[in-house]
């Protein structure tokens, strides 16, 4: 179904992302990461696809050298990048894995305070902060910090 797509531009990038997903599903993570890295390096596709490929590669390459993964994520975590907050979340998890709880909490606080944070990401970050015993910020852009600390028993939100 993807054979008729041009290898250049957005459609070609999507086909390469789909191919990398198929490689991942087949258990060939090294090939999937290499395919995603190749897409991330291409200048003939829109930046959003390059950044997505780089983020997906970092997620698949989680078992490799923590410093290399951190470098990859830090490049995506810059303000204005489309996956900045997701990369910040992963960097906070890397901080925790490295035993740097305070750095992780600082990073998580910054995510919560960002006006562009999605509700799903905010919920994940708040839940993580509560599990770490960290105080939630007093003023959140939207939502209620108390709702995370004491969720409504009738809530249907998983």
What do the PLM-derived regions correspond to, one by one?
Residues 1-14:
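Short extracytoplasmic
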Residues 11-16, 20-147, 156-158:
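Soluble extracytoplasmic domains of inner/organellar membrane proteins
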């Amino acid at each position: 179904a993807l054979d008729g797509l041009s290898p250049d531009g957005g459609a070609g990038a999507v086909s390469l992302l789909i191919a990398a997903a198929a490689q991942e599903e087949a258990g060939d993570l090294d090939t999937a990461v290499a395919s995603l890295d190749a897409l991330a390096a291409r200048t003939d596709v829109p930046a959003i696809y390059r950044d997505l490929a780089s983020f997906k590669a970092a997620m698949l390459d989680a078992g490799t050298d923590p410093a290399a993964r951190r470098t990859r994520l830090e490049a995506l975590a810059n303000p204005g990048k489309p996956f900045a907050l997701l990369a910040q979340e992963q960097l906070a998890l890397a901080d925790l894995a490295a035993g740097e709880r305070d750095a992780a909490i600082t990073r998580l606080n910054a995510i919560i305070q960002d006006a562009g944070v999605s509700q799903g990401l905010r919920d994940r970050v708040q839940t993580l902060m509560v599990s770490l015993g960290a105080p939630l910020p007093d003023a959140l852009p939207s939502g209620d910090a108390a709702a995370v600390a004491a969720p409504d028993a009738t809530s249907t939100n998983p």
